[in-house]
């Protein structure tokens, strides 16, 4: 999977050389507009592969032994990546409000996986309703956009750093080590969404917000490579590929 992402990222960058590449001081480089397009497509593709074939996606990263908990939470992580790609693709002025609707879709679309891990229907569909209402109220200006940023960020922090407490709070099944790790990846994706939208709310440009999100993503990739990959006999190359891609995209967005 990570090899495919690297190839696609390179191909996308070269697809429209007259717009994607420019010379500055003799240096040929990727511009911010194309970096955003590349990053959005890479995120969406990765999410689609994880959602449609979570077991196969794990195998692409060298994880060949996966129980139901790991597979279900890989699908949940994939749904979150697809949602993050949709937020990236949205008009920056409406991205935060739309993220409420996207979150509702995410929760409903991934319900078969999250229900299988023991999360109750009331929590899943209740959160979907809350997010949809917040999305509507944010777009109409009746609610501060920081409310949705907080929902994304706090839920992401809980799922990435406090999986045991999250499972206990909702009365879900205790996950396997891989299931817990994949829940962490789902959580980190929520954090990336919160970083992006928080930067937009603070008045940063889309390129700056995109860069900050990908810097965070690069750090999470390195974190997983050096703290979790060995637990599953997974090569470090996969998560570190995300670190390399993230660093490159962030550089392209911030250098102008």
Question: Where do the language-model regions lie?
Answer:
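Core segments of alpha-helical transmembrane spans in multipass integral membrane proteins
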Residues: 41-50, 68-93, 98-107, 154-155, ...
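Membrane-water interface at the C-terminal end of transmembrane alpha helices
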Residues: 49-50, 130-142, 245-256
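Hydrophobic cores of alpha-helical transmembrane segments in multi-pass inner/ER membrane proteins
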Residues: 80-86, 126-135, 190-195, 243-249
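N-terminal chloroplast transit peptides
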Residues: 1-22
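Cytosolic juxtamembrane helix and N-cap/initiation of the first transmembrane helix
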Residues: 25-43, 68, 137-152
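Membrane-helix boundary connector in multi-pass membrane proteins
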Residues: 107-122, 220-237
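Interfacial loop at the N-terminal end of multi-pass membrane proteins
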Residues: 55-74, 164-183
């Amino acid at each position: 999977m990570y090899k495919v992402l690297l190839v696609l990222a390179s191909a996308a960058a070269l697809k429209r050389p007259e717009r994607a590449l420019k010379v500055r001081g003799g240096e040929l480089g990727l511009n911010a507009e194309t970096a955003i397009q590349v990053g959005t497509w890479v995120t969406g593709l990765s999410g689609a592969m994880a959602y449609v074939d979570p077991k196969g996606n794990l195998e692409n990263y060298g994880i060949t032994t996966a129980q139901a908990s790991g597979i279900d939470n890989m699908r949940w992580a994939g749904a979150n990546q697809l949602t993050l790609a949709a937020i990236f693709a949205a008009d920056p002025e409406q991205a935060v409000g739309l993220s409420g609707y996207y979150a509702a879709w995410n929760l409903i679309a991934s319900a078969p996986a999250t229900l299988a891990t023991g999360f109750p229907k009331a929590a899943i569909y209740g959160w979907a309703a809350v997010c949809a209402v917040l999305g509507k109220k944010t777009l109409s200006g009746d609610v501060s956009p920081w409310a949705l940023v907080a929902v994304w960020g706090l839920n992401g922090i809980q799922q990435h750093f406090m999986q045991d407490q999250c499972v206990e709070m909702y009365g879900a099944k205790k996950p396997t080590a891989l299931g817990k790790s994949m829940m962490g990846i789902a959580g980190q994706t929520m954090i990336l969404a919160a970083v992006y939208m928080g930067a937009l709310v603070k008045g940063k440009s889309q390129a700056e917000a995109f860069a900050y999100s990908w810097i965070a993503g690069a750090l999470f990739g390195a974190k997983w490579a050096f703290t979790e990959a060995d637990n599953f006999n997974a090569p470090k190359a996969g998560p570190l590929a995300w670190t390399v891609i993230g660093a490159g995209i962030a550089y392209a967005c911030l250098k102008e």
